[in-house]
Amino acid sequence: MKSLIFKKHLNFKFIIRMVNWHLNYYFLGRGTPITAGVYINDVCNYHCIMCDIRMKEKPVIYPREAQERDIDALSDMGVIYYSISGGEPTLVKDLPERLAYASKKLPYVHLVTNGSTMTAGLAKRLGATGIQEISISLDGLESFHNQMRGVSNAFEKAWKAISLLQIHAPKVDVVVNSILTPYNLDSLRGLRKKLEDTFPEIYSKYLPLTYHELFLNAEKNTFFLEGEVPSSVEEIKEFIEEAILDPKVVNSAQFLHRAVNFFNGSKDVLPEQKKCTYPYYSIQFDASGRPTPCLTGCSPQNVKTNASLKNYIQSSSYKGLQKKLESCEKCRGSMMLCYYEPRLNFPLHQLLLSSFRGKADLIS
């Protein structure tokens, strides 16, 4: 993922922001957000096996006025990466206008969608927002993807969404997000081939299947498809080595190396990280627009509507949360991409540690 960001935004301003963050963290023990993750609503129109977020009569949606106010604050503080997911974010009717506002204020804006609601009109509106990246969920070829998403034409809709975005939003990078399991390696290979033949410019990203409270499925701990034979760890390792060599796969090598350990049953794929630095460079917002350094590690905070997000982030209470979360282990044992990609690649000392560790894992 960082390769896409670097492709368009590796400039003097970006470098200065990175240098200042590292100086503040290493010498002063402080950190303000560089990335922001927004769960803009709490409903979804699919019935995915790995996620229990569903439709309901009264969905919660991040108030637009509050979101724009928060975007202003994040821009002032130097946030670079702003990602909107859900739920299913395209169920929010004024989503394009929100994305356009974010794109005017922040360098890199990213949207995650299942592609189910895509039309030519929506694709045009999204293309006009100025966002940099749209991720479409596709877990393999038609049969497997439809099974995973609980909708008989999910593949057809996602494929159509990719086509419409290519036509009507050509300046937006499209990335196919695929759940990685022991049951879909051949299906993912087939999908990658189909993408290369039809949309050669499309990228792929792999997300090891994880059960976690963020997806309302924390009580589950195994994934099993009746009548199907799972791939061995050696077969998964072979697939991952292929993915690392594929220039269209945007996962970092560090992340993919750890996925082998994850599928081998490791309960901690970050053993070299004795404390979590994630809260020092990230901020997340729930569907109500409540901020927290980490939705997994602590509950979002109710900040008064007239309060400044910037003042809150600079407050002693927020810094106390950052310090407390250093010892949090709630995401250990999982392989959530939204946490583990950044944790393995940032800050600099973690990137160096994970790089050496990844090479050692390959040798062993």
Task: Show which residues each predicted segment covers.
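A broadly conserved sequence feature marking short terminus-proximal activation segments
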Residues: 1-19, 292-304
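Conserved alpha-helical substructure of the radical SAM core
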Residues: 6-133, 212-213, 235, 346-347, ...
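Short, intrinsically disordered, charge-biased short linear motifs at domain edges
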Residues: 34-37, 259-265, 283, 312-325
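Generic structural signal for small/hydrophobic residues in well-ordered secondary structure
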Residues: 40, 44-45, 102, 176, ...
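Short, flexible helix/strand-to-coil boundary loops that buttress conserved ligand/catalytic motifs
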Residues: 52, 122, 149, 295, ...
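Radical SAM enzyme [4Fe-4S]-AdoMet core and its adjacent flexible, acidic
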Residues: 62, 108, 128-129, 133, ...
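Short, solvent-exposed turn/loop segments enriched in Gly/Ser/Thr/Pro and often Arg
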Residues: 87-88, 210, 333-336
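Flexible mid-to-C-terminal extensions adjoining Fe-S/redox cofactors in radical SAM and related proteins
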Residues: 270-273, 277, 288-364
